[in-house]
Amino acid sequence: MCDDEVAALVVDNGSGMCKAGFAGDDAPRAVFPSIVGRPRHQGVMVGMGQKDSYVGDEAQSKRGILTLKYPIEHGIVTNWDDMEKIWHHTFYNELRVAPEEHPVLLTEAPLNPKANREKMTQIMFETFNTPAMYVAIQAVLSLYASGRTTGIVLDSGDGVSHTVPIYEGYALPHAILRLDLAGRDLTDYLMKILTERGYSFTTTAEREIVRDIKEKLCYVALDFEQEMATAASSTSLEKSYELPDGQVITIGNERFRCPEALFQPSFLGMESCGIHETTYNSIMKCDVDIRKDLYANTVLSGGTTMYPGIADRMQKEITALAPSTMKIKIIAPPERKYSVWIGGSILASLSTFQQMWISKQEYDESGPSIVHRKCF
C-alpha cells in the first residue's frame, strides 16, 4: 500500500508559477509556469497532433510560436477556462493522480473577491469530484513554514504583494495591506530600462528572457544613491548576459534600479507606498500590545523577496520608521520561494486539521458559499 493513496494534494496557484505536490513532502513535486499558450498561426502539417493549447513548461518551450497568457493576474483568476486547464495539467500530467481520490488544499491571496474562492470550490467539487478541499491564505502558510504562529508576513510573488499580520495563528483582516506591485511589474520595468540601453524586448516570449535576466542578475542596493554613484564612476557592477541567439548584452545600474521600484513605486509611475512602508503601516494598524512581536518576527516570503540584499535593506528602512528602541528582526528563510507550499504541506498533514476539510457532502448540502464559513 503506497502512502500517496490517501495523501492530500497541496496546490499553490501563483500568478507566475504553480507549485504542487503531496502533503507531508518537504518540497513541491511539480513547479511550472502558470501559463496557457495558444498557437499564433494556422497549423499546416496534418497528423502532427497539434494541440489548440499548451500548458506550463511545454508552452514555455514552444513560446516562439504561441501567444502566452497568464490566467491569474494580481492573484485573482481572470480566466476560469484556462485555470481549469492548469489544474487538469497539475493533477493528470504533473502529479499523475486522480483528484477524486485525494483531498485538495488550494491557496489564495488575502483580500480576494469572495466569488473567486466560491468558483474555486465549485470547480474542485463539480469538475474534478474531489472528496474534500480547503482554501488557505498564502501568507498564513508561509508563517507556518517558518515555524511561527505570530508575526507579519511580507509575501511578494509575481502578481501581488501583501503584508499580513498574524497573531496566534489568526490573520488580522483589518490590518492586511495589499500592493499590486510585484515580480511581473519589475520584469516590465526592466524591459523598459533595457530599451534605454538600446536593447529591444517586446513580445510575450522576449518578456520571459528579461524575467530570466532579472532573476539571475538583479539585487537590492543598501543605499540607492551611493550605489548609483559607484555604478557611474566604475565598471565594477557591470555583468554580461548571453541571449538565446548568442548575442551578449551588458547591464550595469539596471541590476539594482529594477528592484528599487519595490521601495520606490514612483519609478513605475505608481503613487503607492514601498514594501517597507506598507509593512510598517500594516503593523501600525494592529493593536499597540502586539506590535513588538510583529517587528521582531517580520517574515519574507515569495519569489520577489529572493533578491540578494533585500533583507538588509528592509531592516534598514523599517528601523528608520519604527520607534528607536524597538528590536526589529527580518526573517528571510532560504526556501522562501516555496514557503507557501511548504506551509500547506505542513497544515494538510496535521492530525488536528483533518476536521477542517470541506467534504463533498457538506458542499452538496450548502453549495459554494460553505467556503466562507469553513475557511477564514
Swiss-Prot record:
Note, other: There are at least 4 actin isoforms expressed during artemia development.
Subcellular location(s) per record: Cytoplasm, Cytoskeleton
Residue stretch(es) of the prosequence: 1-2
Protein name listed in UniProt: Actin, clone 403
Pfam families, alphabetized: Actin
Catalytic activity: ATP + H2O = ADP + phosphate + H(+)
GO cellular component: cytoplasm; cytoskeleton
